[in-house]
């Protein structure tokens, strides 16, 4: 049974661009838009568990403070959410963990400031698995976040709370970030648009910029390509790195004939689910019908690349575990960490001597991956090897070896773009026989989001 608030009121089915225009035109006020979103949240979140803390009164006050025709920002007064691994003044940043402090943050983080500059008003913070370390949103410290298409299924992760509440019609757009697929995977599971932008496109956490390879990208999940494009156009008015070609305003399809590489197999995923393969191949045929060239390719990935990436991923868990007091303050309690985090930490400690060579190989992989785009414009793949999985399949309390193998197979197609720093988007272009969304991924070369 689907869980939806889309038809609770006249605003529930509108996208963010339409709500922003309605506020600007005086059709309704920002306060009415925010109040309606809060009511929609309260109607579905007892089932979905997508929000971890609220700021309803502050959001309503911010909306009331806007001029009747908005502030001039494209999303002025549009209600939204910030993922709970990003600082928002007055709210704690728990990172999906019982080990972090419940004390509120003194100020907004860098990304939050850019997010707010577009006019979006956060009504609260959305759920994630502990430290965003897995592809489902089932933290042990609170109820699992459920998929609005079928609450017995996973939303994906790690931006599962944002995806669930956008898909359910609570808000039209919400913050997400991606260190191995965490924008694209929830978008695929919940039938949304999820773009992981090029490295550096938006401000990330300070710790990410200090990593040997910055695999993290900030972004949003939305219900329309138009909203995603409008968000990046608005955000780069406030954060436009000189080293990156601007995305600019994208309001219509391009006219260029594109060279598309098609890959529906993966050495780590094994044989993908037939429904996933059929959907990706159907999209390839549609691209050919539009005049684009499609050719089969093999991705430059192997088990060594996966082992190197997951060692790097485990390094992040070890940093959270053993350096948590430095990162999160003296109230951090590592005794409260979940089994997946502690096992990943041990995985890294037992193999940390391999880390320098793993990083070197990952950097070479990034070069090899980017080289694909000397002959291609886009690469078309599944987002996930199967349709969304049931809750429990990736439970963080599972035996570690089982959890790791399941995760590697399920999410094999998304880490390459994090290592390479290149953009990739999940598009909701199909459904399984069970009625669950199937996401299709288009990946491009560095700074080629417009394609």
Specify the residue positions occupied by each region the protein language model found.
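Short helix-loop capping/hinge segments that flank enzyme active sites or metal/cofactor-binding pockets
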Residues: 3-7, 75-95, 254-263, 314-370, ...
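Glycine-rich, small-residue loops and helix-cap segments
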Residues: 26, 77, 117, 171-172, ...
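Acyltransferase
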Residues: 27-35, 64, 272-298, 321-331, ...
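Acidic/His- and Gly-rich active-site-bordering loop/insert found
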Residues: 59-61, 69-141
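A short acidic, glycine-rich active-site loop
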Residues: 99-105, 150-153, 399-412
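Short glycine/serine-rich loop segments
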Residues: 107-232, 418-430, 434-439
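A short helix-breaking turn/cap at a secondary-structure junction
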Residues: 196-283, 301
């Amino acid at each position: 049974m689907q869980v939806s608030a889309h038809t609770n009121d006249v605003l529930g089915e509108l996208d963010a661009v339409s709500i922003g225009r309605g506020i600007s035109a005086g059709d309704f006020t920002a306060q009415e838009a925010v109040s309606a979103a809060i009511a929609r949240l309260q109607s579905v979140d007892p089932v979905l568990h997508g929000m971890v803390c609220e700021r309803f009164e502050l959001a309503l006050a911010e909306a009331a403070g806007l001029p009747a025709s908005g502030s001039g920002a494209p999303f002025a007064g549009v209600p939204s959410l910030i993922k709970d691994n990003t600082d928002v003044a007055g709210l704690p940043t728990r990172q999906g963990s019982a080990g972090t402090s419940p004390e509120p943050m003194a100020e907004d983080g860098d990304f939050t400031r850019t997010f707010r500059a577009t006019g979006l008003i956060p009504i609260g913070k959305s759920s994630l698995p502990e430290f965003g370390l897995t592809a489902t949103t089932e933290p042990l410290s609170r109820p699992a976040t459920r998929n609005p298409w079928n609450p017995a299924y996973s939303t994906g992760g790690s931006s599962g709370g944002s995806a669930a509440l956008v898909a359910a019609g609570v808000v039209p757009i919400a913050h997400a970030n991606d260190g191995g697929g965490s924008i694209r995977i929830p978008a695929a599971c919940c039938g949304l648009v999820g773009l992981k932008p090029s490295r550096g496109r938006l401000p990330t956490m300070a710790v990410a910029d200090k990593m040997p390879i910055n695999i993290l990208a900030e972004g949003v999940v939305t219900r329309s390509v138009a909203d995603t494009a409008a968000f990046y156009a608005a955000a780069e008015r406030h954060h436009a790195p000189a080293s990156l070609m601007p995305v600019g305003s994208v309001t219509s399809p391009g006219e260029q004939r594109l060279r598309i590489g098609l890959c529906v197999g993966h050495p780590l995923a094994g044989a993908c689910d037939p429904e996933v393969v059929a959907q990706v191949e159907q999209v390839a045929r549609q691209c050919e019908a539009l005049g684009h060239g499609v050719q089969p390719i093999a991705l430059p990935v192997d088990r060594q690349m996966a082992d190197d990436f997951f060692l790097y991923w485990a390094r992040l868990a070890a940093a959270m575990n053993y350096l948590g007091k430095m990162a999160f303050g003296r109230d951090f309690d590592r005794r409260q960490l979940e089994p997946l985090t502690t096992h990943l930490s041990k995985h890294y400690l037992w193999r940390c001597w391999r880390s320098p060579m793993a990083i070197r190989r990952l950097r070479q992989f990034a070069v090899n991956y980017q080289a694909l785009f000397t002959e291609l414009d886009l690469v078309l793949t599944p987002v996930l090897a199967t349709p969304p999985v049931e809750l429990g399949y990736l439970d963080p309390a599972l035996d570690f070896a089982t959890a790791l193998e399941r995760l590697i197979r399920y999410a094999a197609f998304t880490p390459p773009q994090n290592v390479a720093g290149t953009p990739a988007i999940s598009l909701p272009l199909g459904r399984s026989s069970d009625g669950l969304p199937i996401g299709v991924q288009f990946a491009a070369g560095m700074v080629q989001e417009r394609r």
